[in-house]
Amino acid sequence: MIKSELVQIVAARNPHLYHRDVENIVNAVLDEITDALAAGNRVELRGFGAFSVKNRPSRSGRNPRTGDTVFVEEKWVPFFKTGKELRERLNPGQADEED
C-alpha cells in the first residue's frame, strides 16, 4: 500500500470528510512522526508499534562492485518495533515469546 491508497481508504471510510482534508490529515500525521524522529524522540502507537532512531557506528565496509574497502560514517537510522496486537494479528494462534 502506498500513501495515496491509504488516503483513499480513509476517505472511503469517512464520507463526511473531503478527500483533500483526509490527505492533509495523513500528511500531518506522517510529518509529526518524522519531526519527532528527527528530534531523537520515540513515537509509540499502542498496539501497532513504536518508531525510534538508532545509532549505527562508523565501520569498514566493502564496495560490492570493486571489492575495495571503504569507510562508512556513523549515522542515525529509523527503527520500528511491532506492537503486541499487530504481532498477534499477523500470527494468530501463536504464543508471543517476547512478552
From Swiss-Prot:
- Which protein, by its recorded name, is this? Integration host factor subunit beta
Alphabetical UniProt keywords = DNA recombination, DNA-binding, Transcription, Transcription regulation, Translation regulation
Superkingdom of this protein's organism: Bacteria
Organism, scientific name:
Rhizobium leguminosarum bv. trifolii (strain WSM2304)
Q: Identify the gene encoding this protein.
A: ihfB
- Taxonomic path: Bacteria, Pseudomonadati, Pseudomonadota, Alphaproteobacteria, Hyphomicrobiales
Which GO BP terms, alphabetically?
A: DNA recombination; regulation of DNA-templated transcription; regulation of translation
Disulfides per UniProt? none
**Family assignment from sequence similarity:** Belongs to the bacterial histone-like protein family.
- DNA-binding as a keyword? yes
**A GO molecular-function annotation:** DNA binding
Its assembly, as annotated, is: Heterodimer of an alpha and a beta chain.
